[in-house]
């Protein structure tokens, strides 16, 4: 398995910026333009795999829902497991949950109770890091079920929002934007 970039490629050219979505004043970074380009998506996953492989994970955890798009193919590429962190009512069987605060309210994440064996090395993935609340809560939830969280990875980091400061694990961001 090779993690070499087939060609130098600026992946930011494959991210579409959509103003005022999902609401006025928000600039949305659309990754659908990246994942539908076979060449760009291969380069992106190769670059992520190179960093994540060094953390030697047993399993990758994807945050609902766009984190699944990154974590699942990377787990396949790295030969490790994949599990999902989801909103309430989306996972069958017994789940463990964690409520966490947002700027304007509260949210909740769930994981299947048997998804992680105690001591397994886990990397958590999402599409974008903004304020860091969801990623920090995901790390806490994974630890609650006995995971050793060895890193976090995102496609896009919005550096000005300082979400990285809420994390106590190494973070890999494929692309960084300053607003």
Curated annotation (Swiss-Prot):
The keyword Glycosyltransferase applies. Its EC number is 2.4.2.7. Pathway: Purine metabolism; AMP biosynthesis via salvage pathway; AMP from adenine: step 1/1. One of its GO terms (biological process) is purine ribonucleoside salvage. CDD domains: PRTases_typeI. It is an enzyme of class 2 (transferase). One of its GO terms (cellular component) is cytoplasm. It catalyses: AMP + diphosphate = 5-phospho-alpha-D-ribose 1-diphosphate + adenine. One of its GO terms (molecular function) is adenine phosphoribosyltransferase activity. Keywords: Cytoplasm, Glycosyltransferase, Purine salvage, Transferase. It is found in: Cytoplasm. InterPro entries: Ade_phspho_trans (IPR005764), PRibTrfase_dom (IPR000836), PRTase-like (IPR029057), UPRTase/APRTase (IPR050054). Its main location: cytoplasm. Catalyzes a salvage reaction resulting in the formation of AMP, that is energically less costly than de novo synthesis. Belongs to the purine/pyrimidine phosphoribosyltransferase family. PANTHER family: ADENINE PHOSPHORIBOSYLTRANSFERASE. Homodimer. This is Adenine phosphoribosyltransferase. The gene is apt.
């Amino acid at each position: 398995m090779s993690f070499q970039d087939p060609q130098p490629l600026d992946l930011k050219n494959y991210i579409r910026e959509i103003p005022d979505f999902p609401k006025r004043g928000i600039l949305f970074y659309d990754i659908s333009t990246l994942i539908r380009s076979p060449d760009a998506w291969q380069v992106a996953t190769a670059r992520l795999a190179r960093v994540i492989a060094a953390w030697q994970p047993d399993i990758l955890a994807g945050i609902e829902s766009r984190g699944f798009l990154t974590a699942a193919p990377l787990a396949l590429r790295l030969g490790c497991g994949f599990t999902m962190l989801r909103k309430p009512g989306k996972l069958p069987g017994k789940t463990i949950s964690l409520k966490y605060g947002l700027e304007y309210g509260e949210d909740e994440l769930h994981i299947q109770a048997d998804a992680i064996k105690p001591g397994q090395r886990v990397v958590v993935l999402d599409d974008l890091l903004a304020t860091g609340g969801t990623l920090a809560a995901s790390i806490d939830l994974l630890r609650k079920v006995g995971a050793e969280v060895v890193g976090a990875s995102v496609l896009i980091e919005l550096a000005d929002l300082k979400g990285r400061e809420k994390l106590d694990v190494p973070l890999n961001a494929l692309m960084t934007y300053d607003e």
